[in-house]
Amino acid sequence: MNIEIAGVTRRFGRTEAVAGVDLSAGPGVLGLLGPNGAGKTSLLRMLATVIAPSSGRLRLLDRDPRGYAERKQIRRRLGYLPQQLGYYPGFTVAEFVEYFALLKEMPPAGVGRAVAAAIEATGLSGQARSKLRTLSGGMLRRAGIAQAIVNRPDLLLLDEPTAGLDPEQRVAFRAMLRDLGERATVVVSTHLVEDVGAACGQVALMDAGRIVFCGTPAELTTRGDGTDAAGDAPLERGYSAVLAAARAAVGARS
């Protein structure tokens, strides 16, 4: 397994953003679904080794990220697109992606080819020499995706990756995700149910810091059968039904 999490929590002061999560994942595309404030971004930042768990056990790519040397090895095999990625407006797209390739300590001889491949995969070949400050929001997001995949990561973490993409770009992105999931573990954090249904083989649904469902999109869909859960599509109704049941259970316990 490329991700192994047991009893992981993350607190910020008195707020418990992630509350005892258990999760494992191998190659494939996992959709991390949930409403805003569910804890998705905090969990993704722990998987990206940006922040450490407050408690619990976390192993990534068969390594323990608590040690500096192990964490460095993980980061060489990791791709991460945060929700808010800092861009250097004076860089061209190619320079921006190359900068991240060098940060990931890729062998210099292969950087040029890797940068070109990542830019092509995200549909930005025509903008490779364009300054970032001249790009639209959707193009900037694609440049962010390019830096995340430039090292052909074994673990790819994407936080709201389709934000700013138009419908055609989202379709192309979902196809790219499916291809990447053939060999790598891809975790996509989103609140858009349709992205999960189109690209993900597995779904983990978070609410109030906990994972309240883990299974396939088809299994999530069946949770809405025979209910009056809100949603225009079957998967949306399954999502709503699971959230309602989880919140009702919390209310009953309290």
Where are these regions (language model features)?
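Conserved ABC transporter NBD signature motif
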Residues: G56-I74
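Helix-to-loop junction immediately C-terminal to a conserved catalytic motif
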Residues: A48
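Conserved ABC ATPase "signature" region
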Residues: E98, L102, A109-Q127
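Conserved ABC ATPase signature
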Residues: K131-G138
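Catalytic Walker B motif of ABC-type/P-loop ATPase nucleotide-binding domains
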Residues: L156-E160
